[in-house]
């Protein structure tokens, strides 16, 4: 466990991690502060951040399992201690980490007797198991236990309609949220008009993200939600026939880039996040896993550096070079100087 003394700046707004610990492979804790804030700001930020942490961050879950020759969910299988329903509940608890977008397939094929755990799942290369010891089933006889799995990345909850499928597959209710809980509290200090606030934010995650990573992703999601309001043109705001509708001008990556470059190119590079570019989701996720969030981060890496990223291909480099050439008329160095 890491714990730091809380020191409050009287001028510059800053955030800091004051406590972090790993309670288990599937339970991480972090405590953060943001200060100094004016009266009322801490509650505004705390409420928005908590909602973003719990509802806006994506996670990866097993959403379907396929058995062979199983008539219904509450069946028992000879040689297996658990019922089909119990196996489904065990699969629901398995925590995964990935940069997957959409759905993918996985499988388990084990010969008994013995215990089947999460480490027996055969996964695609871009999906990892957080806790390999998670239990799936107990095989009491020398039987072959083979099941197919569907893995999906999403956010929030996914409640499947209970039904039996002809192919022997069963849906699994999924809780995609990597943040288990988030709380905020406020400490006020100072007197009269000089009164200020400190925001304390506590985050518990399931191990697929650290609390710091969750805080960063929630912040990015909130920024993306508000960006259109920052860049709408006043001459495009109007009311139609006294109706309360306000059409917003379309805001593109190129629009934001053009405005920023007029002022300062370095600021522009720091202000453009790669998830706002035209990069495919798979490339974006690979970059994000390597802590590359802005175009400035990207340009601080050479082509050689990017090729060291897991699952990165030469075709991905070509796509990145194409976007840099199109919008910046610059190239990415092949090697680190």
From Swiss-Prot:
According to the record, the residues making up region (Alpha N-terminal domain (alpha-NTD)) are 1-233
Taxonomically, the superkingdom here is Eukaryota
For this entry, list what GO says about its biological process.
DNA-templated transcription
What is this enzyme's class at the first EC digit? transferase
SMART domains recorded for this chain? Answer: RPOLD
Domain comment (free text) = The N-terminal domain is essential for RNAP assembly and basal transcription, whereas the C-terminal domain is involved in interaction with transcriptional regulators and with upstream promoter elements.
Its Enzyme Commission number(s) read 2.7.7.6
Q: Hey, which family's this protein in?
A: Belongs to the RNA polymerase alpha chain family.
Protein name, as recorded:
DNA-directed RNA polymerase subunit alpha
Gene Ontology cellular-component terms for this entry are:
chloroplast; DNA-directed RNA polymerase complex; mitochondrion
What does the UniProt function comment say about this protein?
DNA-dependent RNA polymerase catalyzes the transcription of DNA into RNA using the four ribonucleoside triphosphates as substrates.
Keyword line: Chloroplast, DNA-directed RNA polymerase, Nucleotidyltransferase, Plastid, Transcription, Transferase
Catalytic activity of the protein: RNA(n) + a ribonucleoside 5'-triphosphate = RNA(n+1) + diphosphate
Describe its assembly.
Answer: In plastids the minimal PEP RNA polymerase catalytic core is composed of four subunits: alpha, beta, beta', and beta''. When a (nuclear-encoded) sigma factor is associated with the core the holoenzyme is formed, which can initiate transcription.
Main localization (coarse): plastid
The UniProt annotation puts the region (Alpha C-terminal domain (alpha-CTD)) at 264-337
Under the heading InterPro entries, the entry gives: DNA-dir_RNA_pol_insert (IPR011262), DNA-dir_RNA_pol_RpoA/D/Rpb3 (IPR011263), DNA-dir_RpoA (IPR011773), RBP11-like (IPR036603), RNAP_asu_C (IPR011260), RNApol_insert_sf (IPR036643)
The record's listing under HAMAP family reads:
RNApol_bact_RpoA (MF_00059)
Record's keyword annotation contains ATP-binding: no
The protein's location, in the record's own words, is:
Plastid, Chloroplast
| An annotated Gene Ontology molecular function | DNA-directed RNA polymerase activity
């Amino acid at each position: 466990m890491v714990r730091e003394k809380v020191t409050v700046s009287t001028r510059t707004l800053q955030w800091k991690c004051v406590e972090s610990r790993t309670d288990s492979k599937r339970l991480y804790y972090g405590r953060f502060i943001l200060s100094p804030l004016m009266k009322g700001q801490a509650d505004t930020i705390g409420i928005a951040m908590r909602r973003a942490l719990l509802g806006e961050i994506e996670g990866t879950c097993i959403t379907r399992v396929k058995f062979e020759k199983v008539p219904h969910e509450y069946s028992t299988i000879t040689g297996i201690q658990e019922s089909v329903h119990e196996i489904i509940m065990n699969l629901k608890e398995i925590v995964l980490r990935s940069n997957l977008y959409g759905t993918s397939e996985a499988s388990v094929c084990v010969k008994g007797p013995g215990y089947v755990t999460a480490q027996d799942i055969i996964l695609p290369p871009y999906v990892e198991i957080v806790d390999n010891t998670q239990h799936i089933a107990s095989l009491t006889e020398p039987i072959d236990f083979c099941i197919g799995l569907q893995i999906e990345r999403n956010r929030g909850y996914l409640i499947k309609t209970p039904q039996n499928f002809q192919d022997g597959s069963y849906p699994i209710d999924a809780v995609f949220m990597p943040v288990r809980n988030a709380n905020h509290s406020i400490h006020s200090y100072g007197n009269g008009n000089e009164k200020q606030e400190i925001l304390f934010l506590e985050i518990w995650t399931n191990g697929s993200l650290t609390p710091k990573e969750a805080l960063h992703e929630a912040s990015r999601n909130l920024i993306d939600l508000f960006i259109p309001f920052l860049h709408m043109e006043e001459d495009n705001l109007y009311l139609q026939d006294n109706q309360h509708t306000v059409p917003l001008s379309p805001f593109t990556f190129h629009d934001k880039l053009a405005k920023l470059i007029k002022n300062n190119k370095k600021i522009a590079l720091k202000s453009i996040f790669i998830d706002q570019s035209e990069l495919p989701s798979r490339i974006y996720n690979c970059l994000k896993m390597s802590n590359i969030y802005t175009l400035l981060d990207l340009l601080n890496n050479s082509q050689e550096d990017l090729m060291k990223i897991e699952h990165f291909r030469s075709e991905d480099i070509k796509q990145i070079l194409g976007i840099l050439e199109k919008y910046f008329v610059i190239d990415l160095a092949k090697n680190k100087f």
